[in-house]
Amino acid sequence: MIPIIRPGLVVKRLQSPKIFLTLWKTCYNVKTYSTESIKQKKPQDLNWPTFLKLRKSRRIFETLTSIPTALTGLGLGSAYFLTRTVDPTMTIMGLDLFTLYVIGTIASGGLGWLLGPSIGRKIWTLLHKSQARQIAAREQEFYRHLVKNRVTPQMESYSNPIPDYYGEKIYSLSDYRRWLRDQKAYIQRAFWRTSNR
């Protein structure tokens, strides 16, 4: 008669080994099924080629979204500035009002162009909502790889600029390998330049 203590289960005395085996199998099965259900609920990780393709499509979508936002900004700016009355005798900082209104219209188009990528990223994320967490996790891991392998900015000079510091041109595994080679070549060039002095 052995006292057995398990989490949530206390049996003081077992009368037969059959009861012990039954309890042991029950606890083992509960543990097995619970871990299997956890494994099944966990989503599959994105592989690197898929992540890099999604990253490229996001970048293209952000750039293309800048076009309608720039046109919208230009349209709103022209609707506001170019419909106002202009007094030809009034000047601000030596410029007549019509010139300032044209500058304001162009600036509102530029503001629309600058807002385009952030709006495009939000829309793209909503379109790929099912993979948003996986993409965010891969993005963090990708950034850690970049930080670990890229050149320190102290080595930069005008004659030897750092190649693709933020990894914006990496859209495939071959691009990533090329980026790594460029970083190593940059370090070698910087080393030879400093050692020859």
From Swiss-Prot:
Protein transport among keywords: yes
InterPro entries: Pam17
A single GO cellular-component term on record: mitochondrion
Top-level taxon in the UniProt lineage: Eukaryota
Record bears the keyword Iron: no
Transmembrane residue ranges: 63-83, 97-117
Membrane side Mitochondrial matrix: residue ranges: 34-62, 118-197
Family matches, as Pfam families: Pam17
Residues annotated as transit peptide in the record: 1-33
Mitochondrial intermembrane compartment residues: 84-96
Record membrane topology: Multi-pass membrane protein
Summary of subunit composition and partner proteins: Component of the PAM complex, at least composed of mtHsp70 (ssc1), mge1, tim44, pam16, pam17 and pam18.
Similarity-based family: Belongs to the PAM17 family.
Function comment: Component of the PAM complex, a complex required for the translocation of transit peptide-containing proteins from the inner membrane into the mitochondrial matrix in an ATP-dependent manner.
Protein name: Presequence translocated-associated motor subunit pam17, mitochondrial
Species whose genome carries this gene: Schizosaccharomyces pombe (strain 972 / ATCC 24843)
Gene name, Swiss-Prot/TrEMBL: pam17
